[in-house]
């Protein structure tokens, strides 16, 4: 498994090189809507560390021209979560997000830490709903990487991984915002490579209450954190349903029965 970790690490470093060269803000207007900005709604996607290795192709295909303008900022800061917050605020001002009738937000893991802090500092009255993409599995990786692979973590993400690992999640308190939690049930390949360390951690629960975040609805998908970039079309209908209604519709409310690591056990 150590050989696999080295190979995977090299691939991630290559992905980082591509990310640094090609990362950019994604701003896409809904072609079907010619109304002024004050009558339009927008989706803001705050990705996470996985955006280093994955493109926004599936995100764009899943959320573009669905009645919303789509914004995916290149906001990650190698320095800190505070740096991420500053980048989000700069993006929000540049693209006049406060002028929209409603803004709906999809937060990945780093995005969740960033969004909550950003909203506390720069509250926008038109934030209507937020979906938090959370993973009891993937959220163990920042501390693991900090402790076992500090050099690799610093090469990939600078100080951001360390800041994330050392910062307890602070939930957003905003009664006027509809909040949903989408829970991933599948492990990533990288966590599989850290499986021995993962087994030494306290047991993980998929109970939505464990995330310490108020929610109006929750759902489960057998998707990994990588899949939430490359296969988000599978979860997009439920996310869009939440943005429009405040519920995940017919999405699964029971924890996934599958082994989170089953995909990788087959190839062991």
Where are these regions (language model features)?
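Bacterial N-terminal signal peptides that target proteins for export
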Residues: 1-9
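Bacterial N-terminal signal peptides
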Residues: 9-17
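Active-site catalytic motif of lipid deacylating hydrolases and related acyltransferases
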Residues: 27-101, 225
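Serine-dependent carboxylesterase/thioesterase catalytic core
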Residues: 44-45, 70, 82-176
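Short aromatic-enriched loop/helix-cap "lid" or pocket-rim segments at secondary-structure transitions
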Residues: 57, 141-146, 190-195
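Active-site loop/turn elements of alpha/beta-hydrolase fold enzymes
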Residues: 75-77, 135, 184
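C-terminal catalytic-base region of ester-bond hydrolases, centering on the histidine
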Residues: 172-268
């Amino acid at each position: 498994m150590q050989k696999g970790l080295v190979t995977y690490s090299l691939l991630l470093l290559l992905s980082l090189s591509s990310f640094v060269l090609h990362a950019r803000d994604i701003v896409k207007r809904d072609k079907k809507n010619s109304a002024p900005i004050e009558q339009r709604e927008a989706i803001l996607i705050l990705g996470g560390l996985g955006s280093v290795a994955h493109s926004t192709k599936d995100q764009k295909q899943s959320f573009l021209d669905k009645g919303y303008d789509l914004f995916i900022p290149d906001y990650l800061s190698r320095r800190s979560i505070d740096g991420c917050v500053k980048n989000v605020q700069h993006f929000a001002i540049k693209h006049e997000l406060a002028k929209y009738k409603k803004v709906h937000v999809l937060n990945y893991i780093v995005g969740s830490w960033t969004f909550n802090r950003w909203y506390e500092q720069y509250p926008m009255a038109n934030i209507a709903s937020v979906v938090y993409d959370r993973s009891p599995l993937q959220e163990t990786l920042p501390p693991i990487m900090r402790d076992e692979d500090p050099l690799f973590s610093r090469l990939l993400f600078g100080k951001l991984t360390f800041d994330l690992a050392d910062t307890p999640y602070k939930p957003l308190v905003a009664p006027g915002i509809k909040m949903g939690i989408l829970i991933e049930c599948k492990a990533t390949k990288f966590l599989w490579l850290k499986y021995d360390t993962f087994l030494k951690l306290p047991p993980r629960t998929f109970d939505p209450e464990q995330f310490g975040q108020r929610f109006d609805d929750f759902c489960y998908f057998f998707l990994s954190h990588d899949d939430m970039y490359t296969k988000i079309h599978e979860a997009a209908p439920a996310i869009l349903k939440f943005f429009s209604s405040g519920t995940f519709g017919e999405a699964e409310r029971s924890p996934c029965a599958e082994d989170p690591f089953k995909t990788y056990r087959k190839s062991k």
